[in-house]
Amino acid sequence: MKMNQIKIYLIAMIGLLVVSCESYLDTEPEGFISAGSPTVEGAEGLVTAAYAGIGNNDMIGPIASMWVYGSVRSDDAYKGGGGVSDVEPYNFYEQYNLTQPFQSWLAGLPYTWENYYRAISRANSALRTLNELTDEEFDLRQTRIAEARFLRGHSHFMLKVLFKYVPYIDENLSNEEILQTSNREYSNDELWNKIAEDFEFAMNNLPETQPQVGRANKLAAAAYLAKLRLYQAYEQDENHQVVNINQNRLQEVVDLTEMVIQSGNYSLQPDFAENFLNGYDNGPESVFAIQFSISDGTTAGRLNFENGLNYPHGAPQYGCCGFHQPSQNMVNAFATDANGLPKFDTFNDVELSAEDITPSGVTVDPRIDHSIGIDGHPYKYRNEDSYIFSNSWVRDPGVYGYFQSMKEQQAADCSCYKKQGPFMGVSTNIDIIRYADVLLMQAEAYIELGQQDMARPLINQVRKRAAESTGRTRFSDGTAPSNYQIAEYDGSNLSWTQDNARMALRWERRLEFALESPRFFDLVRWGIAEPTLNAYLEKEKTRKDFLNDAQFTAGRDEYFPIPQREIDFTKGLYEQNVGY
């Protein structure tokens, strides 16, 4: 698709979005029942609107899929598309060139900030109405309050991992007080605790199961609180460097994840593929997900369009736009040794191509064929000729290579798929927390507590499932497209010291969640973003010319800058992040 087509379409979208900072923080959702007339029906509608708020996503201000902010900014993926100038702000993020002037037609970060605060405003609107009702008037009042607080916690959490210091807005602030709330009202640790209060309330006031799918429950709140405490455990100084790992916070992570595990309400999907296929939404592995649907009575339906740029550009069934391409480093990371373990030290020595990834070629982790489109391999678990991935499907291989992301896409004949203009939307959910994440969060906490032996069986659960997930990746005759070799850690094939366990855990997270976006945030949490990403760039510069000037700057690039328009609007009340 030509650049001017993208601009025309997205300028029209922005026309619906651009409002003043004040209005998106204090405007009530459409259909809001005015103060003085709270009703149960009105409160229920506002809670529903708050759920919709966390999924009101778009390509110019993503809040559900973090592929731009978490994958492209890491060593997992390139921006892709039609060269570096195609959706240029995303190229700036990839290059860590984050001080470019505001581009009104396609800004990215400012609209992500805005969309999250719109979602927070919806949660607060629901809470204000619920607070005016009594338990006698509405027997589900406490449950709905807990749900709204969970949703508010989610949006504040995401803002925090993106920007670090953000204004905390709750339902008790007046419009005037909102305008006087600084993004530095709380210290880093205090802000974590403020956000945690919402998840703690939700955990203590929600049932373990809900009668309607998609609603937050007690265990989802416990899992999210565990995720927050894990991030908080890695204590940072003002320059974003990890200076301490808080053991008490790690123990909280163990206890909270154990609550989820022992409930028996969740398990790994039998086949890894089922996390990325239509028909398996809200399955046993989905702890909390953002819900989408193919039709809600509107023209476009309630579809996820945030990944609409990421389909194979040259595939006739799609036709656009070739973004979010796996990096060479990411592809290489799936290679395994003769024992079926990752090539921790040598994985990036050899540049793998489709000619290497064959039934008789290098041994690889099976998750490669769930994550990456490779020439000659079935795409999206379809083995008919029209879905065998081809190099001709890649939009700009001279810049970004021949691989394509695959997890977030769906087949063009799926009942979940709809093409709106040049872009693709799907109704499949976006998982925010999977059960695999719960297992690996607990494993990480155990390792950092010096109890790495407790972590090994947790990691092995994830690896065992990967080993058993090869049925859907095969050709029509039953043969595998790659030479799969993966083994569990038995304590002797890798000496299970704390350092080795940590290395194994971090590798497992990368492969399990490849191209799902956690990677950059993991690197920052662990305090290894600068050495990891600059080592990645040093090697990638020998492969990809467009990265020649890319450089990660420690003490700055761990977080995005506060959008300048927010600083201007608050007349300097908001402080810019260090380094910008």
Residue ranges and their predicted role:
Residues 20-22, 77, 102, 116-119, ...:
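Long, intrinsically disordered, low-complexity segments
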Residues 39-40, 44-48, 52-57, 83-163, ...:
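Conserved, well-structured interaction surfaces
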